[in-house]
Amino acid sequence: LETIEQVKEAVGDDTAIACCVSAMEVGRSMQFFGARVNLAKTLLYAINGGRDEMSGDQVGPAYRPVTGDVLDYEDVMAKFDDMMQWLARTYVHAMNCIHYSHDRYNYERLMMALHDRDILRTMAFGIAGLSVVADSLSAIKYAKVHVIRDDKGLAVDYRIESKGTPPQFGNNDDRVDTIAADLVTSFMQKIRKHPTYRNATHTQSVLTITSNVVYGKMTGNTPDGRRKGGPFGPGANPMHGRDSHGWLASCLSVARLPYDE
């Protein structure tokens, strides 16, 4: 959750919300929009060594997949980190190509005429599926998650073995809220390693608008128990129905996400 104090500290008091959530100085800054990446599918790619869990195609790099029948937290995190490194590099490169081409063939002259000559350019990256990934990693860490494979050895489903419900994002529980916050920081650090078009400043949002439905439709079963094709929680929200401790606990979980990242 953003506060006026956070916004003023970051960009000053002469600000407006551009696009959906980005605070920017009016007339002094602009944004190269960047949509978002599907972090939940990235986790599944990490488990399957870059193969798509729905089509079986080799989409990501052919890293070593998880081979055990039970997901090990440290093993999954190491593979997930490698896959996020690849994703961040691919994401920034794609954004640079898009906005170079956009400026070349459809430069927004009228809107730029209303800005200062020397402006701050930002490039807006984003994450979708944060609560799905946080809950999945929480289940792997605090319960036992069994892998179910198809006849080709592809991990296509998961079974959680637990005496109770593993910690779930949205309930003011440090065990899972910390995982979510660390993911935001970690992915942003990876994004910042890669230079941007026109030296734009890297920014990141945990925003989906309505793409949480579309992204979920294209994502298979996840280790948190979410079913294939099911929508993600919108934006930085908990997954549907998992915030069982009231709205304040849900807000406190979201507020743990670092605004500076």
Regions found by a protein language model. Give the residues of each.
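Conserved catalytic cores of very large enzyme subunits
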Residues: 1-261
